[in-house]
UniProtKB/Swiss-Prot annotation:
Protein's gene: gag-pol
Annotated binding of Mg(2+) 1, by residue: 701, 776-777
Ranges where the record places region Interaction with host CALM1: 8-43
Active site: residue positions: 517 (for protease activity)
Residues of the Integrase catalytic domain: 1205-1355
Protein source organism: Human immunodeficiency virus type 1 group M subtype C (isolate ETH2220)
Residues annotated to bind DNA: 1374-1421
Full protein name: Gag-Pol polyprotein
EC number: 3.4.23.16, 2.7.7.49, 2.7.7.7, 3.1.26.13
Amino acid sequence: MGARASILRGEKLDAWEKIKLRPGGKKHYMLKHLVWANRELEKFALNPDLLDTSAGCKQIIKQLQPALQTGTEELKSLFNTVATLYCVHQKIEIKDTKEALDKIEEEQNESQQKTQQAGAADRGKDSQNYPIVQNMQGQMVHQPISARTLNAWVKVVEEKAFSPEVIPMFTALSEGATPQDLNTMLNTVGGHQAAMQMLKDTINEEAAEWDRLHPVHAGPVAPGQMRDPRGSDIAGTTSTLQEQIAWMTGNPPVPVGDIYKRWIILGLNKIVRMYSPVSILDIKQGPKEPFRDYVDRFFKTLRAEQATQDVKNWMTDTLLVQNANPDCKTILRALGPGASLEEMMTACQGVGGPAHKARVLAEAMSQVNNTTIMMQKSNFKGPKRAIKCFNCGKEGHLARNCRAPRKKGCWKCGKEGHQMKDCTERQANFFRETLAFQQGKAREFPSEQTRANSPTRESQTRANSPTTRELQVRGSNTFSEAGAERQGSLNFPQITLWQRPLVTIKIGGQLKEALLDTGADDTVLEEINLPGKWKPKMIGGIGGFIKVRQYDQIIIEICGKKAIGTVLVGPTPVNIIGRNMLTQLGRTLNFPISPIETVPVKLKPGMDGPKVKQWPLTEEKIKALTAICEEMEQEGKISRIGPENPYNTPVFAIKKKDSTKWRKLVDFRELNKRTQDFWEVQLGIPHPAGLKKKKSVTVLDVGDAYFSVPLDEGFRKYTAFTIPSTNNETPGIRYQYNVLPQGWKGSPPIFQSSMPQILEPFRAPNPEIVIYQYMDDLYVGSDLEIGQHRAPIEELREHLLKWGFTTPDKKHQKEPPFLWMGYELHPDKWTVQPIQLPEKDSWTVNDIQKLVGKLNWASQIYPGIKVRQLCKLLRGAKALTDIVTLTEEAELELAENREILKEPVHGVFYDPSKDLIAEIQKQGNDQWTFQFYQEPFKNLKTGKFAKRGTAHTNDVKQLTAVVQKIALESIVIWGKTPKFRLPIQKETWEAWWTDYWQATWIPEWEFVNTPPLVKLWYQLEKEPIAGVETFYVDGAANRETKIGKAGYVTDRGRQKIVSLTETTNQKTELQAIQLALQDSGSEVNIVTDSQYALGIILAQPDKSESEIVNQIIEQLISKERVYLSWVPAHKGIGGNEQVDKLVSSGIRKVLFLDGIDKAQEEHEKYHSNWRAMANEFNIPPVVPKEIVACCDKCQLKGEAIHGQVNCSPGIWQLDCTHLEGKIILVAVHVASGYIEAEVIPAETGQETAYFLLKLAGRWPVRVIHTDNGSNFTSNAVKAACWWAGIQQEFGIPYNPQSQGVVESMNKELKKIIGQVREQAEHLKTAVQMAVFIHNFKRRGGIGGYSAGERIIDIIASDIQTKELQNQILKIQNFRVYYRDSRDPIWKGPAKLLWKGEGAVVIQDNSDIKVVPRRKAKIIRDYGKQMAGADCVAGRQDED
């Protein structure tokens, strides 16, 4: 105790002991109070030494003050003691504790005011557009969301109807909002009830997930602490506004507003997908669809996609070709990657028809004939053959000069221990039992997967074979099934595919080295002279068509085995032995299905699999499909199924590129509609500017990607398809997929998510290797030397192969430049692939579109590219083939772009150790260019911006939009924002920013003097100019005649009115301002009542698409000072009223709205919503909306939306709510929103049962839905339900059919009670008034009825429906015998559907017919027991 007595000494201790504990009390502070405070501080984990100084006391006060409201008496006493001690330290004279607290409060207020004054100068730097702000006392208070924001939100939903633009608009409008604000926004949406219900379901699901992940902590909440928010708290249903503010501003904060907004955005995404159901991935060209129609559909869907322009450009470049039908795709790929849209459309005209095929054949014949003539002149000497290395496979050097690491073993036979020159075999022994380059035993598949994927004995044997991917050769003496059983398993000779299967073949007496390629249909050899006749042919090759000579019945000897078939001779990069020869040798290639864990897939809720009949197919297509499916079955990709699978999807076949082979296609459109939605795991493509510089680079491509990933076993049954037989000779053969099918919407996202799982085991032990993966394209980089780099590349390929993924050699790029994702990569730089701008005398719309696309693609590395003038040529609805005349500006722009593209430009790679800088230049004509760089003159990437955004704008506003685009792009590519260098002076920026700080966000930036600089051309005054003439301006126009007037009246007696034609109200308002500026001096005050005109001019535009606005801008620039103000119209303001009468004369229609006063009276009494007033008093909606907007009691929250949950007519929800310490029992009719409510004396079962019986006596109640409260689970309520025949159900948390309706009605009822509480003395009276207002004075929801009208309508409709059903059931007891036309024989019996005066409607089997009464006999159906010999139709005739 003595130790802490040293806190105060001498004079301070005397002053301490003179202070009274309470005003007017006798007790004074003593030394023991200091000792007590010392001990209490230790309880609260605060340092007692802080009591020694005034600064320490101030810190303690700051720490304790927030907990005072919820703290104990001891905490309050401790705070009072420390506050008094602070005054003693500061030598502030006080008499008692209350004075000390008052002094502390005064000091805090002064400090707060100083802080706010100091921050006033910097107010422009931080956005204040948040609903939660700090008041003068330092407390966080809530500013309700403004009506202007709500109006903007409602307008967006009404105009856009949940198109993709709704989500960013919602995000912007709800910045910083609390859950209560967000609910207000959602409640203002009047229509779109289905969408709102979807949103509500999503919120409920997310809230339940939140509760699962954040369980409630056991035990009570500690003093001074907030409880943790539950899911329903975040959604604003069970939390108060004060709790929401406390969570959002606490330490640490819980951003409940942001969390709730994220849930809403998830729901909005689902709604947007529902309203825009067609994805760009679903746009595919039909087999016979013209290419032009397909392109029209493609670009129409592309506009609705939620993607950046770069991604849309990529979609155009890749998906347009990828989703074309095979005939068009063959031609499009032959055109190359840089083909324009016009070239594509021209090339694809009439594709597939006989005329097209004749043209192709004629061209091929002429080419071959020319070649033949040339060969005769040169005595058949072929081109000199380039030398080729045996070791690495490259041309240009021999194996002894090869620098690549030497292959192990003999290059001919594959055995180790000798080299090729010492090899005795001189021929590749690929058919021996011992494997070349044996790699050891690879992983084996689990037996379950083998059974699922390989139904036949033969395929099971292959799936369990030692190698992951192998070529099997069936010997001439294959085992019988019995023999196989005796020996245990078949043991065919195998060739591993760890290296390329190159063999030596003998053809036409010549030895050649060739590649065994099971992926090739045909056998293709490089230039070789073969005997016999040949015919010309074109086949699809790498990069386009290859012209070849076709020789038939050619004998090829492969390792002692002979095969006879067709051989094609032409300029192939490698000799290929295709399937036409390999099948004769009995070879098959086994692709195992990857052992990746399958992704579970389901159908959409409430949907079943597709049951689409197979359409007829020609005999040749059936044969082709049968062969393809047998091969796929052997490889385990599909399995046979029986009749127990009820699902089916149509299958068909189309010719491949060379038009000799067939390709199987499955029409998965119906399955795609029924399959669950997937989230695209990868939302964009990687950009080379974001790549870090690497010493060594390799680019790989994954082959047979989809067919290597297994499909969820539970979902496989839905992929069933049938191969029919000709003339239904035999039952169709049924299959289902075991792997991801081509054309199914789940294949891309599942493959995207599977690849990272496969690459992760390789990435972890190889951190020095960087892998960029987009779908099946792989970029692999490292800082290793090229020799060291290639070793892990081979490891990666082997790793992928073990998982069932191949990396074909033909797409394995080892040397620069690397072609990747449309770019060209070099070791230290990158660029876009070469771009050639076409030279044309006449340009079509299609030409300009392709030209702009090329320039946009080039602009990411070529600085200064402009397309604005070219884009202007495309305005308006024009056909693709329309001729466009280039304007002088467009020709100049095109010429400038040609000059820019003449010199190749490269970008460098990103260095994380250096700063990222973005510099912007203004190009004029609303066009901007920018560069990202880390070192001067070494650009990472460039770009352009040419979006105006609004009709009236200025350069500063555009500059902010450019900065935001750049910041977003930078975050996507590099994960951070750059330092900006902007062509605008700080003074200019500050002048605009002072008034428009809320318009946008600007990061850190510095001024760069790059002309032309951005500047403001004029500024408006903030206050009226004294001694200057004031112009009151106004305009009016008639909607029907389009005749209007504009003019002004001045405070000095001047006036001017001009008549206008073909105008609108908005134009006349602007015309009036222009007249005032024109007729005034260098300084002027202008007063308008047009918010539209005021908004345009206050934004200080310096350019506009409107001629009138441009004239106003010119006048403003010429003035020295201008003050512009707004006053509300029709409020009796002097000058405004005078000019209004002048311009309205003969223009505006005068409306005598007698109901306005009555509507205002009604609203003051009942606070009716605007729909009810508009309906009852027959006044335009704008008037009641204004009445509601002006009522302070109706601005608490948006209107409640009724009838969102569609339930049966007999369901009611009951709940108890509390107000003013009393209990209100509320019952809500779910289907209509009708309310019954009463104040009950106690929350007991007896009172609840009595209320329930009263309710059942007034309305038909079949089911009641309650929570699990003790009064609802009581025996009294159960007895009342039993007696009245009511079924009782209890609520389930977060179930939309649970207590959601009554919970929302509780809030609505309390809101109405708050509006009318002053009119009633007792709460029970106010409750009944509120029930009356809700049921009969509020309209909205289903049908636009009030709740009272709606419940009556629903019950009446229910009675009518039941009555109608009874009549239908009665009428179905009759049967009809009838005669048809002149046929004398009676037919029947048929079902009676309807009986009229002159005719009856009957159903005979599946046909519905109308029969005249005179030709029909109606009898009652008495069943089989009455069907005796005497039961004749005529005797039972009811007519």
